[in-house]
Amino acid sequence: MFRTMLKSKIHRATVTQADLHYVGSCTIDADLMDAADILEGEQIDIVDIDNGNRLTTYAITGERGSGVIGINGAAARLISPGDLVIIIGYGIFDNAELGDYHPRVIFVDENNKQVELGEDPAHAPAGSGLKDPRHPEGE
């Protein structure tokens, strides 16, 4: 049996640009792509935290160290500069591969610089104001 699993997650990145007239895709700083194990041309989902829009597109490598998160083409009607987004990549694994399976979960700061790398998709970094869905308030 094959299962589609979370492979890569860039959490709470800030959109730096959006342009209807670019070829459709999402431009991502090469440092973040490397950290999250996302390849150019790889299918990704983008979830806009500010407005709830969710879309599927593909990754384009942006300038290394620039912090760029660019929404290109028609998606620029759904996601705007300044919006916080989650960028998600998935992998298809057979059951034998799942024993060594570990997603790459990247947290970034307001300039889209990596501040934390983990493997737990539900982890909420201390002091982030985020909640871990596995741990109710007060535990």
UniProtKB/Swiss-Prot annotation:
Any GO BP: pantothenate biosynthetic process
Claim: Cytoplasm is one of the keywords in the record: yes
Superkingdom of the organism of origin: Bacteria
Keyword Cytoplasm found: yes
A Pfam match: Asp_decarbox
Co-factor note (free text): Binds 1 pyruvoyl group covalently per subunit.
Record note on modification: Is synthesized initially as an inactive proenzyme, which is activated by self-cleavage at a specific serine bond to produce a beta-subunit with a hydroxyl group at its C-terminus and an alpha-subunit with a pyruvoyl group at its N-terminus.
Binding sites annotated in the UniProt record for substrate: 57, 73-75
Molecular functions per Gene Ontology: aspartate 1-decarboxylase activity
Cofactor(s) listed in the protein's UniProt record: pyruvate
Keyword field: Autocatalytic cleavage, Cytoplasm, Decarboxylase, Lyase, Pantothenate biosynthesis, Pyruvate, Schiff base, Zymogen
Listed EC numbers: 4.1.1.11
SUPFAM superfamilies: ADC-like (SSF50692)
Pathway of action: Cofactor biosynthesis; (R)-pantothenate biosynthesis; beta-alanine from L-aspartate: step 1/1
Function field: Catalyzes the pyruvoyl-dependent decarboxylation of aspartate to produce beta-alanine.
Family designation: Belongs to the PanD family.
Protein name as it appears in the record: Aspartate 1-decarboxylase
